[in-house]
Each structure stands twice: as structure tokens, then as C-alpha cells.
Design a protein with these regions (language model features):
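Polyanionic/metal-chelating signatures
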Residues: 166, 171-312, 439, 473
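Active-site gating loops and adjacent loop-to-helix segments of metal-dependent hydrolytic enzymes
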Residues: 144-160, 201, 218-220, 268, ...
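Boundary at the C-terminal end of the N-terminal hydrophobic targeting segment
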Residues: 68-72
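Bacterial N-terminal signal peptides
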Residues: 52-64
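Histidine-rich, glycine-flanked metal-binding segment
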Residues: 73, 82, 86-128
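His/Asp/Glu-enriched, well-ordered alpha-helical/loop segment
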Residues: 143-145, 149-154, 287, 328, ...
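C-terminal cap of metal-dependent C-N hydrolases
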Residues: 80-83, 419-463
Length: 474
């Protein structure tokens, strides 16, 4: 493979800034008391500080310029088997990427490669879309506290640590986009956030946004045993449903008051952050991602969704195979997890491999998720193989890792398949994606490499070893 044009990650630039700091620190004592009139006769300390700031800005400017230059150079990936998910696999195909998006793909000889393109020989490799996890907790669970069971004003991205090693392990597993959620210990634990694993060192750099710049995400809800405990939390399933009905009724009344006030600030009710989030749910602007296991709990979610008209994705659905027809009639998608190790809890005792196949046959849109740490993100790819073993078709198994999840997050126009105009998020494998022996070689997000198994530091997060599970400042 031709060595790719690698852009140093921000962590490296930070280390360079630190090196500048160290170097200047060592020479600081050599500076005269006054550096000269060019620095306006400032003191040695102030002059030194200004010099350090100037060096830092220069380095960061170069980093930005280099990154932009790399994204402008077309990249042509040739010779691989390309599985676009939307469309038939392409043997010995070519994938052309430029400015972070897919410009062309097709059989060898059918794609015009610009003379300026950087070429990557992927003969013998397999290229698939970037993997999408619809339910993850990496970066620190955070979310609601013990003050009450319903907390729609809580935003998970206010508590995420982007330097958490889970992000490095996720790209090592081929993941390129996530729905990061609060935990499930509440009836409603807060707002989720949809992120791209671009390698940014701030949460703002990871968040996906709409055309108006608003951060995208859903709303996390749960029922069953997780949210049942001492007051003020509910103690029964019936009380859980009653509390949520009351909250949605209040949100509907708040929405109606806002609508009646039009643009008159004097008529508007006092701003209520709790109810604002629920109004977004009622208006369909925020999808509910609902943790639920038992078949009766699943039916309760469908009942509430029908009553209040909110959009919902069912998560886990350990007993979803028992009510697959009911889920299909409600036209509600399911995000499932396949756990092949013992443990868990009693309400998930009927979780089986055949769930995906049964849901597919019933016509239910089905995706997989990790619920990381329940399943390590590095093992996400193998869920397709487990699902196919349990009865899913090969096509549905691959979609469950990619396009199905994108649809559940309303992101399928941007990600989830390899298609002209979509974001250049893809994974390079050394074999069949359904084989448990297949490894992720490289992960690319928006046309930039974010994981390379050939890099010793990346390999550490892919295969384990000393330091792999320790959160470190990159």
C-alpha cells in the first residue's frame, strides 16, 4: 500500500507546543532584561510570553493549513472489494474521495482518477462504510443525577471527556459515528448527542450539527427495572408510565401556550428547560431512544408513542422477538445488542441471537449497538456475523452496522453507505466483514485517516497492552 498522506493529530501539535514551551524555557535565562525596542521595551517576562504565544499560533496555523491542504488533494483507493451497502459489491473497485466527501466509486477503469490524486493500492482488501453505533456510553456516562426520575434538560455533551480512551478504541473498531447517551437509571435521563469520531480534542469538534448549526441528538428514556427504586423514583411499572404521561401532558400544555403567544414576549410562559426538551420530542425534532427489555415493557413504549405521537427507536428489546409483529405494525425501528457472554440481569434473560432475524422477517428496521462498555466498541464489527448466524440475511447484517443506524439518527443522507455526495467515512478491512477473523486496518472519517493498525500507538488501542485501558492526555 502506498504510504498515505498523514496529517499529524492535534495531540502531536499540542506536544510540539509543549516542546516550544520547554525549549523557550531553557533559553529564557539567556534573554537580556530587555529584548529590545521591537517589543516596545517590555519586560523580559512579558517579551518571553509574547514570543511563546507567537510560536504557538504559528504552529496551530500550520496545522490548520496542512489539514486543509490534505483534504483538498483527491484520494483514490483502488483494487479493493467495495461493499457500498446501497448497491451491489464492486470487485476490484475504485473509491475517489475529495474535500471530505465521496466523489465517485465504481469498477476499475470506470472511475476517472485526477492526475493530482494520491493513490492507495488496496488490492486484496475490503472497503465498507464507517460503522455507526446507535447506543454508546463512551466518554463518561454522566447525565441525570438522583434528584428525580425525569430530567429532559440534562445534556450528555456537557459531561463528555473526549480524551477518554474509549474514543480511540471506537475508531480501532471501525466506528465513525455514535449516538452517545446518558445512562438508563431514569425514566428520562436527558438529551443524547450524535458525534463523528474526527479526532477533535473538544466535544464541539465531534458534535454533528444541522444546517443551522444546532447540535444534533435524541432523548434517552427507559422503563423496566433500571428506573425503579425509592422515592422520588417510581417503584412499579405502572407508576413509571403514569409519571411519563403526566410529563408529556405538561409539555403539550407548554407547547400550546408558546403557540398562542406567537411573538408576543409578554404572553409567553416563563422559559422551562425541562419542558423545552419534551416539546422537541412532541414536535418530532428529537427522537426518543428508549431502553426496554421485556415484551410488556416494549408494548408500553409503543402505547405511549401512539398516545403522544413521538418518534421512537426501541433499544435492546431482549424480548422483541416475542412481539415482532406488533413492533412492525407500529413502524418502529429497533436497535439491538447481541451479547455472547454470560451475565446481565433477569429482565434480559431471554435475549437471543435470533432476534435480528425475526425482526428482519417481520419488516422491522434493525440496527446493532454496543452499549459500550457492555460490548467493547472494538468488537462491534463481529455483531453482523453473529446476527447472520442467528438468522439475518447478509445484507441486513451489514446494514445493521451502517445504514440502518444512520436512518435511526436521521443521518442517512450523510452517512451509512458509500454513495456519491455522502461523507467519506469508510473502513478498510483485511477480509470478509462477517468473519470473526477479520481485522480493521484503517478507519477514515470525512476523508481523513483516524486509525491505522500499522501505527504502534493505534495498534495499542486496537489490540490492548500496557496503557491501552488507561485514559491518558494524548
Amino acid at each position: 500500500m502506498v504510504a498515505p498522506l498523514r496529517i499529524a493529530p492535534l495531540g502531536l501539535w499540542i506536544r510540539l507546543v509543549d516542546a516550544v514551551d520547554l525549549s523557550l524555557g531553557r533559553t529564557r535565562g539567556l534573554l537580556p532584561a530587555r529584548v529590545g525596542p521591537s517589543l516596545f521595551g517590555l519586560s523580559r517576562g512579558v517579551s518571553f510570553l509574547m514570543l511563546k504565544i507567537a510560536c504557538t499560533l504559528l504552529i496551530l496555523t500550520l496545522a490548520q493549513w496542512t489539514s486543509a491542504l490534505a483534504q483538498e488533494v483527491p484520494h483514490a483507493f483502488t483494487g479493493a472489494k467495495i461493499i457500498p451497502v446501497e448497491g451491489e459489491p464492486i470487485e476490484a473497485g475504485t473509491l475517489l474521495v475529495e474535500a471530505g466527501v465521496i466523489k465517485a466509486l465504481g469498477p476499475a477503469g470506470k472511475v476517472a482518477i485526477p492526475a493530482t490524486a494520491k493513490r492507495f493500492d488496496l488490492k486484496g482488501k475490503v472497503v465498507i462504510p464507517g460503522l455507526i453505533c446507535t447506543h454508546s456510553h463512551i466518554g463518561g456516562i454522566g447525565g441525570g443525577d438522583g434528584s428525580g426520575p425525569v430530567q429532559p434538560d440534562v445534556r450528555i455533551y456537557d459531561s463528555l471527556n473526549v480524551r477518554d480512551s474509549g474514543f480511540r478504541r471506537a475508531v480501532a473498531g471501525g466506528l465513525t459515528a455514535l449516538n452517545i447517551m446518558p445512562g438508563s437509571g431514569h425514566l428520562l435521563s436527558g438529551q443524547t448527542v450524535y458525534v463523528k469520531l474526527r479526532g477533535s480534542k473538544t466535544i464541539e469538534g465531534l458534535c454533528l450539527r444541522d444546517k443551522e448549526g444546532r447540535i444534533l441528538g435524541g432523548m434517552k428514556m427507559a422503563n423496566g427495572t433500571n428506573s425503579q427504586r425509592a422515592a422520588p423514583f417510581p417503584g412499579t411499572r405502572s407508576k413509571s408510565a403514569a409519571l411519563m404521561r403526566a410529563e408529556f401532558i405538561r409539555a403539550g400544555e407548554y407547547r400550546d401556550k408558546l403557540a398562542a403567544a406567537l411573538d408576543d414576549p409578554e404572553k409567553k410562559p416563563p422559559r422551562d428547560l425541562r419542558l423545552e426538551g419534551l416539546v422537541e420530542v412532541l414536535e418530532g425534532r428529537r427522537v426518543v431512544h428508549h431502553h426496554t427489555h421485556r415484551h410488556d415493557d416494549i408494548m408500553t413504549v409503543l402505547r405511549l408513542s401512539r398516545e403522544f405521537g413521538f418518534r421512537v427507536v426501541l433499544h435492546h428489546v431482549s424480548e422483541g422477538w416475542m412481539v415482532a409483529e406488533e413492533i412492525a405494525r407500529a413502524k418502529v425501528p429497533c436497535s439491538i445488542i447481541l451479547v455472547d457472554s454470560p451475565g446481565g440481569k433477569l429482565e434480559a434473560v431471554n435475549l437471543v441471537f435470533k432476534t435480528g432475524g425475526i425482526l428482519e422477517k417481520a419488516g422491522v428496521l434493525t440496527a446493532f449497538h454496543t452499549d459500550d462498555w457492555i460490548t467493547d466498541s472494538r468488537l462491534f464489527l463481529r455483531m453482523a456475523g453473529l446476527g447472520v448466524r442467528g438468522g439475518m440475511s447478509r445484507e441486513a447484517g451489514l446494514k445493521a452496522l451502517t445504514l440502518a443506524g444512520a436512518k435511526m439518527l436521521d443521518l442517512d443522507k450523510r452517512i451509512g453507505s458509500l454513495k456519491v455526495g455522502k461523507d467519506a467515512d469508510f473502513v478498510i478491512l483485511n477480509g470478509d466483514p462477517l468473519s470473526v477473523y477479520t481485522k480493521v486496518l484503517e478507519t477514515w472519517v470525512e476523508g481523513r485517516k483516524v486509525f491505522d493498525r500499522g501505527d504502534p500507538d493505534d495498534l495499542l488501542h486496537a489490540a490492548g497492552g500496557y496503557g491501552a485501558g488507561v485514559d491518558q492526555d494524548p
